Regions:
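A short beta-loop-alpha structural element at the N-terminal edge
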Residues: 4-23
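Conserved GNAT-fold acetyl-CoA-binding loop/helix
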Residues: 23-48
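A short helix-loop-beta-strand connector motif used in the catalytic cores of GNAT acetyltransferases and
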Residues: 47-61, 89
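Conserved beta-strand in the GNAT
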Residues: 61, 67-76, 89, 94
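A conserved beta-turn-beta hairpin within the catalytic core of GNAT-like acetyltransferases
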Residues: 78-90, 100, 147
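Conserved acetyl-CoA-binding loop-helix of GNAT-fold acetyltransferases
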Residues: 92-95, 101-114, 118, 137-141
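Conserved beta-strand-loop-alpha-helix junction that forms the acyl-donor binding cleft
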Residues: 100, 124-135, 152-155
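Conserved acetyl-CoA-binding loop of GNAT-fold acetyltransferases
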Residues: 139-149
Length: 155
């Protein structure tokens, strides 16, 4: 595989890929404490795509030629819930199942960081599900550290 490129501002032609790839990767994003039918997860993901369009954001696509390999959705200018300082937030990232383990996630994460710097945002936050070990390794290798823990209990 030749080196993939990252395109900023994914266009309308990328929408079907983003929806399909995002929905297919939902299984690794769901906590076992928050089981939900796949259709509910799909609906919520599509709602997320609509919500971010009302904020300053970028959708980045990793591609090799016309072949789309993964995408990341980063939102800017969000106030931190504790300090109130401006932050960027990686709202979603997905890589095609057959393309995982080839550096696509790292490429997209680097691009998100570059976009955050371009927006003069000194902090990029994200959340990762406890059971998603591959994503945790990716983020930790890139220098991300646990700041808080979100605890939950199934009732």
């Amino acid at each position: 595989m030749s080196a993939p490129t990252v395109r900023r501002a994914a266009g309308a032609a990328d929408r079907a890929f983003i929806e399909r790839c995002g929905v297919e990767s939902l299984g690794s994003s769901v906590s076992p404490l928050r089981e939900a039918p796949m259709e509910a997860l799909r609906t919520n993901f599509l709602r997320l795509l609509e919500i971010v369009h009302s904020r300053s954001h970028a959708i980045l696509v990793a591609a090799e030629g016309e072949l789309r390999l993964g995408f990341a959705l980063v939102v800017f200018d969000l106030p931190d819930e504790v300090t109130g300082l401006s932050q960027a937030f990686l709202a979603y990232m997905a890589v095609e199942v057959g393309q995982r383990g080839h550096g696509i996630g790292s490429l997209l994460l680097d691009a998100c960081e570059e976009e955050a710097r371009r927006h003069e945002t000194p902090y990029l936050g994200l959340m990762v599900t406890e059971g998603n070990a591959a994503a945790q390794r990716l983020y930790e290798r890139a220098g991300y550290r646990t700041e808080r823990r979100l605890l939950g209990k199934k009732l």
